[in-house]
């Protein structure tokens, strides 16, 4: 399940809600599961019918990150909803799963998108990250920066992950548009497609608070015990978000 985003930053693009339909904005391929990050399948409604599923990314042995709009329809137990971004933390059994560390991404960096495809297998798309913007006409991103990339995604990948070249989780997939778009000042990004994720760096304080509350432990203790929770990610200051107009 994947939602598209409607914004005044996007010009002359037909938008569709992706509830009960199948949309693809570019080529993906099956992931090499021997070295790909672990991605979980989340059934929504009737599995494999009309895109009736989402994805999640293991965070700890007990918790995963996914899209909020997926978590609201999935059968998993929700630990926390982000108050303004399309992200949620849910309970899942992630023992023996590969836990990708959380990380950062910079403009023009190469990224990969991972999620569960129509066949129930993990798929991957490749592209680059451009910038963060405000989608002022979107309920999902009215108060949350939208990170723009051109890596392809499709229905079912919502809640899956965006990863940098180091294999670090830099965002949770939220939505798509089929074409590039212009900023309000008329500049064109030159992107063939528009895929959107929520940056893990932007929500790192919420992630830390949610994990601490769940385990009843402070972050320093958790960092020492959980490979995906690194001091480099959680202790460095989060940069101020300056959305492009």
Predicted regions located by residue number:
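Terminal peptide-recognition signature
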Residues: 56, 62, 66, 90, ...
């Amino acid at each position: 399940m994947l939602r598209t985003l409607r914004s005044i930053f996007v010009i002359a693009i037909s938008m569709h809600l992706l509830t009960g339909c199948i949309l693809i904005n570019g080529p993906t391929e099956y992931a090499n599961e021997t070295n790909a990050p672990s991605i979980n399948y989340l059934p929504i409604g009737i599995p494999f019918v009309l895109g009736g599923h989402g994805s999640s990314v293991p965070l700890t042995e007990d918790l995963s990150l996914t899209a909020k709009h997926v978590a609201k329809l999935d059968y998993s137990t929700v630990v926390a909803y982000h108050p303004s971004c399309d992200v949620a933390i849910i309970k899942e059994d992630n023992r023996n799963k590969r836990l990708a560390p959380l990380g950062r991404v910079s403009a023009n960096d190469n990224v990969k998108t991972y999620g569960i495809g129509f066949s129930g297998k993990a798929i991957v798309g490749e592209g680059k990250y451009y910038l963060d913007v405000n989608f002022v006409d979107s309920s999902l991103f009215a108060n949350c920066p939208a990170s723009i990339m051109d890596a392809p995604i499709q229905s079912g990948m919502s809640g899956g992950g965006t990863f940098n070249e180091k294999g670090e989780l830099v965002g949770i997939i939220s939505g798509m548009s089929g074409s590039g778009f212009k900023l309000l000042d008329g500049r064109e990004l030159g992107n063939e497609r528009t895929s959107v994720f929520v940056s893990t760096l932007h929500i790192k304080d919420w992630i830390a608070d949610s994990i601490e509350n769940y385990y009843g432990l402070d972050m320093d203790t958790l960092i020492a015990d959980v490979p995906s929770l690194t001091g480099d990610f959680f202790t460095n200051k989060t940069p101020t978000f300056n959305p492009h107009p």
